[in-house]
Amino acid sequence: MEFKYLVFIVLCQYLDNTFFSETEAITTEQQSLSTLITPSLYVTTDSQNTAGNALSQTTRFKNISSGQQASPAQITPEQATPAVYVSSSPLTYNITRQAESAVNNSLPQTSPSGFTLTNQPSPSTYNSTGQPPKHLVYTSTQQPPSPAPTSSGKPEVESTHNQPTKSTPTIYLQRDTPPPPPPPLTSEPPSGKGTAHKNNHNAIAAILIGTIIISMLVAILMIILWKYLRKPVLNDQNWAGRSPFADGETPEMCMDNIRESEASTKRASVVSLMTWKPSKSTLLADDLEVKLFESSEHINDTSNLKTDNVEVQINGLSEDSADGSTVGTAVSSDDADLALPPPLLDLDENLPNKPTVTVVSPLPNDSINPQPSPDGLNQVCEEQHSKIQEPFPPPPDSFNVPLSAGDFINNQESAHEAQCQEFSTPDLHPDLTDSLPPPPTELL
């Protein structure tokens, strides 16, 4: 099937739609047919069903005078728009057999205007007459229909009714004036399973990374708080030890804190850092020296205690001699360098049996103090011996026999005296000087 028949069928369908319109629209459509038949046509088909869709698609052409523009036909956005281009240049065209079969199937259609295929005029051939096209029809998928002016000057609004499932071919007619710029097309992002899967994976990865970071921060905070609470801060005022200017002893709490701090710190000896280590012999020698030093200190302490006791005894004897209760022997200054007498024995055991004789070195103050007379000293000694040798009173014959008032008083007094003698401490200093010879007359 040739291309001219296809174009004729399209024009017939267009005329069918125009006959139902007003009379003014019919006159304008007839003029547009005369202008569209003169130039040569160039048709490009994108698929096998393009010709069939073109046969069933209704297209509205408008008669436009020279210098006027044609309004685009409205097409639904879901339909594909294969381009149909009309050129004035002589070109040779090859029609595929698929298009021919599609057109042959559409031949039984009849045109409502009464024209048949045999009545097609000859100017619709392949070769163009060389006349430049004067009009251009541009079909857009988004531009709304616009009113088309007629030769009488009255605009007419015409709309095309397209089938929602078929593609509409776009016909371009060249003209001298440049066409208006096409409107911007908004392309929707393709939505499919691939993009959905990618979005899901990205969201899952973001959630995992966020949970990991949050869990790490929480764990770090918990560790810091645990360490801070495990070691409470001690408000110790004596953290540096006992102050050298402090008066008195440190309290028990401070001492406990100091001991704990000392126990916690580990001290290393300097000997462990030395290359030379002391042997066992040197250690033993050091131990012996320490022991000898301690023993010498102990001996010195005991000797000092003995000398202190002797000095105390000498002072006591000098005081007693000043009171006239004791008799001391005067020793010349030549005998002052003699050794001290041996320590005194237990006086309690030897006192009643044998009086001890001691030689006491006189003090320098003793020579100044006057000595008591020997008669007075003898009387005092006799009184003390009589008191010590006095026997205890005999016990009563029987406790059942009642005693008289005088006997009872005497018994009480005797018991009281016995208890006093029993618990009283005897004066030892006079007993020590009982057997001493009288002092020389030079000192008197």
Swiss-Prot record:
InterPro entries assigned: EVI2B (IPR033239)
Keywords tagged on the record: Glycoprotein, Membrane, Phosphoprotein, Proto-oncogene, Signal, Transmembrane, Transmembrane helix
Region (Disordered): 104-197, 318-337, 361-444
Extracellular side stretches: 24-203
Glycosylated residues in this chain: N63, N94, N104, N127
Pro residues: bias regions: 177-187
GO biological process: myeloid cell development; negative regulation of apoptotic process; positive regulation of granulocyte differentiation; positive regulation of neutrophil differentiation; regulation of cell cycle; regulation of stem cell division
Feature: compositional bias, Polar residues: 104-131, 160-171, 318-332, 361-370
Physiological role: Required for granulocyte differentiation and functionality of hematopoietic progenitor cells through the control of cell cycle progression and survival of hematopoietic progenitor cells.
UniProt protein name: Protein EVI2B
Lineage: Eukaryota, Metazoa, Chordata, Craniata, Vertebrata
